[in-house]
Structure formats: structure tokens, C-alpha cells
A protein has these predicted regions:
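Residue-level preference for short coil/turn positions at secondary-structure junctions
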Residues: 7-8, 70-71, 124
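Active-site-proximal loop/turn and secondary-structure-junction residues that shape catalytic pockets
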Residues: 81-83, 134-137
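Conserved SGNH/GDSL esterase-like catalytic core that processes O-acyl groups on lipids
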Residues: 12-112
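A structural motif corresponding to the C-terminal end of an alpha-helix
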Residues: 112-130, 158-171
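A structural signal for short, well-ordered beta-strand segments and their strand-loop junctions
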Residues: 13-15, 74-78, 125-132, 170-171
């Protein structure tokens, strides 16, 4: 039934920014297992917020949610889309600091985020799934083609780093 998890289903706990909402109460079957998604929203959360050294409201909310989930659960993390917006996050840093190297900035952002998740997960042993950054829905009238291509490159590099760092760190 819609909105109700039965005992036959395995729960996937979904944590993240607004893209996690598309998973809420979603049911699907994989290899004859039935899964049910429960989403927890952290409005405005970026990987940068979680991966930096500063305690902030995003970390506090993430940790509150993360520690309430039963140990050894399946957890889907959907964080990173805001880091990759055309007028926020990485693009804004590059615009304001032209000497910053794009590849290094993205790798540092992703690595710090993954390390943060690994550190939190040491005692919980959750099975972590990292969701990549989706293709944005951009109004082409508001941005020139070069800017859109630059954003596309940022997302491509970001997702490649997410995949590679997650794999390297055995996440």
C-alpha cells in the first residue's frame, strides 16, 4: 500500500537535498527483493557543507538523521546537486577565484565529503549508496552556451570524482 512499509520490504533510508524527495515512498524490486524508500530532507545541503571542518546546521541535521537509522541499514545519499548549480557552489568559486583549479576544487570537495561519511559510518556499518548529480534543467535564455558547457563539464568531473573516490574508499 502507498506510504506504508510492510515487513516484506527492505528499507532504503534516503538522506539529502531536494533530489532525495523523488525517492520518498518509492517501491522497487531488484533481484526479487522488494525495497521501500524513506527520505529525509536537509534543505540546501551541499557536499561542501558536510566535508568542511566547520560545524554547521547541515552537519548537525545530517548527523541527527544518520545516527537515528538502525545500524547496518541501506542508506542512499543524495547530496551534491547544489554544489553543481550554474550560479552557486563550484561555479561561484571559479567565477570569484579564477586561480582556483577546477579539477582540484572538485576532487577536494568530493573527497572531504566521502571522508566525512566514512568517519560517521565507522560504528554504524551502514551500506552506503552515493547518488550522482543529475542533469540540470536550465533556461537557455538566461545563460550563454559557453556557461552551460562549463556547467556540464563541472557535473561530468564531479560525478566522475564521486564514482572514483567512492570506489577507492570502498564505499
Amino acid at each position: 500500500p502507498a506510504g506504508i512499509c510492510t515487513n516484506k520490504e527492505k528499507i532504503i533510508y534516503c538522506i539529502g537535498e531536494s533530489h532525495t524527495l523523488s525517492s520518498h515512498e518509492l517501491r522497487f524490486t531488484n533481484l526479487e527483493e522488494i525495497y521501500y524508500c524513506k527520505s529525509q530532507l536537509i534543505m540546501g545541503c551541499k557536499q561542501w557543507h558536510l566535508g568542511n571542518d566547520i560545524k554547521n546546521r547541515y552537519k548537525l541535521k545530517f548527523e541527527e538523521i544518520f545516527y537515528q537509522i538502525p545500524k547496518s541499514s541501506l542508506v542512499l545519499l543524495s547530496v551534491g546537486e547544489i554544489d553543481c548549480r550554474i550560479d552557486e557552489g563550484i561555479m561561484r568559486v571559479i567565477d570569484n577565484s579564477p586561480k582556483v583549479k577546477l579539477n582540484e576544487l572538485i576532487l577536494k570537495t568530493v573527497t572531504n565529503y566521502i571522508n566525512y561519511v566514512i568517519k560517521l559510518n565507522r560504528e554504524l556499518n551502514h551500506i552506503i549508496i552515493i547518488q550522482g548529480v543529475p542533469c540540470p534543467n536550465i533556461n537557455f535564455k538566461n545563460h550563454n552556451l559557453a556557461r552551460i558547457r562549463q556547467l556540464s563539464e563541472v557535473i561530468k568531473i564531479f560525478n566522475r570524482n564521486l564514482r572514483e573516490v567512492s570506489k577507492k574508499k570502498k564505499l
